[in-house]
Amino acid sequence: MIKKLRNQIGLITLSLALLLPAHGFSQDGNPITPRAAVAKQALREVGLWGIGAQVEGQEPLPSDLWQDADGESIGLAFRKITPDQKFMPLQTLLQRVLFSGGTAPVADEFTSLERFKLAARIGPINSSVALLAQLPDNITDTYTALAIADTLLMANRIDEACAIINGLQTTNAGATLGKMRAVCYALNNEFSAAQLAIDTVPQTGQVDPVLQWMAKAIANLSAGAPVSNIVFRGEDGMQIAISRKLGLYPNREALDRTYGAALSAITGDISLARAAVMLRASSMSLITAQQYSEFAKDVVHVEVTTPVVSSSQAMPPVNGALVEPLSESKPPVVGRNIYDLLYNARSFNDWVGLSGRVKSQLRQVEGLNSAENGFLANSAIINGDTASALHFLGQTDPLPWQDLARSLMEGGENNLAIQRRLEAAASPKNTRPIAVSEALLAWSAGLRGRGLSELLNTNLPIGTMPPAGTMALLDMALARGSKAEVGLLAYLALQGMDPKTADVASVSRIVSALSHVGLEKEARELALYVIIARNIELAPPPRQIPSREQRPSTSTTRPPANTALPLARPQVPSNNNAPRPSASAPQSQTKKP
């Protein structure tokens, strides 16, 4: 059973904060989603599971999504899921599961509240606060109140957040409540009270780096000292609020630790790091491709260049005088900067985000060679842009896996794509195990084709295995036909894994489970994502500069804590005469947009 708040004044404060009329909690103060999507009477009939909120650019799942779910299984998933997900189709699916209301499963109120607390961490931030704002006024769980307050801190709604914190009179929340009180005092410039609250936070005997960071930050705020020796932290609302108070913004290391609702909350913060923040948010499905494109509309434009290549043919002298060699003009290249932007992406997920950003401009690119057109076809496929995919594939010799990926993108049942994949000529990059692995992903996603016997004749490569217990729960959820439970366990099974190294047979089981509970589109997207992730080749990373520990120190001066984050790799002068990548392995000079 859930724990009750001890002080009824706290209940009144919490209720008032949750029932604020129609204002959402957007960072700019503008209204967002209407507060109540479910009327009070209807809410009593369907319970907390009927509450939902809109995620921009996404369709909610059907109202039967929670049907036949096991309460213990989904409760475990709610508690164990983190925002650390590299399979972005599963990130999108998790958002749709958490923010879709439907018929209640057989589960207690505690489990239903776990859904709201997870939604508060996963984001996007506007959807999180809109969902939490619809909780009824009889919810008295301390940890739910803390989740609401932390989400409001992320959304920069300081007064509402601190009203909830100040109203709680409980000792059951441990260190979290003490830290939140310290943050609220600091945000209100009551630094002595903030330092006292930090000193009284319960200790566990282990060093708490967040508590140490907060103590240092509050001391600096109190003294008005420079903040050059304090770095941005943004893993939760408390850290974001203090970082904003100090005027900090994330460096690369801090941004790599920022996920979910916390990351989406800082997309509107103006700083030198905003371009990198927006790219990361786009690659993690926290903003739409359209939102990212609108942000970057003045950054990316289609360049036109006219390469001139000197003739290699020797020219004879005329009357003893040397003659300059003839130059041969080539057709203009349109949009090489678009190609370079994509090819120099720092990671596969960044490449996905950048592909969405340039979707409307991709079709304008012309004049590239065969291998480069094949590379751009991948962006069109991951965007679901059939016309552009066919255009670029028509200007190259498609690689065996690209034909399979295109068929997954188009949907339907392609009886030849799998067969062509299995019959493709062998090469070091197209061994039999690789071909059968990709065919297995396509089979699992619903593509039909001959060749299943190859699974008996081929030893598939073994990659990183998901937890066996999670996979067993997934099989049980599949047998019950629970959409939401299968979606949650699919996310949990691949949490923290790399699409390039995850065990392909296990991923195929997950793809098949999604398909068989009615999530066919999501299954295809996941299979497509994995096939491209395992094949695409981006520019090699730049040479790493030795770290401070690896080289002699010449100065005791520390670098500034806040430095602007580059959007792509370092720029080198463009050389349109340089050889371009081959069809089998794109290689290019490193460029920055």
Regions from the PLM with identified roles:
Residues 11-21:
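Bacterial N-terminal signal peptides
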Residues 25-51, 539-593:
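Compositionally biased, proline/threonine/alanine/serine-rich low-complexity intrinsically disordered stretches
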Residues 59-68, 82-83, 98-105, 132-140, ...:
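Solenoid-like repeat scaffolds
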Residues 73, 105-113, 137-146, 171-180, ...:
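Generic helix N-cap/helix-start motif at coil->alpha-helix transitions
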Residues 118, 147-152, 184-185, 379, ...:
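Residue-level signature for tetratricopeptide repeat
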Residues 122, 155-156, 188, 383, ...:
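Structural motif corresponding to the intra-repeat A-B loop/turn of tetratricopeptide repeats
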Residues 160-252:
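Extended amphipathic alpha-helical segments with heptad-repeat/coiled-coil character used for oligomerization
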Residues 214-390:
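Long, internal scaffold/assembly segments composed of regular secondary structure
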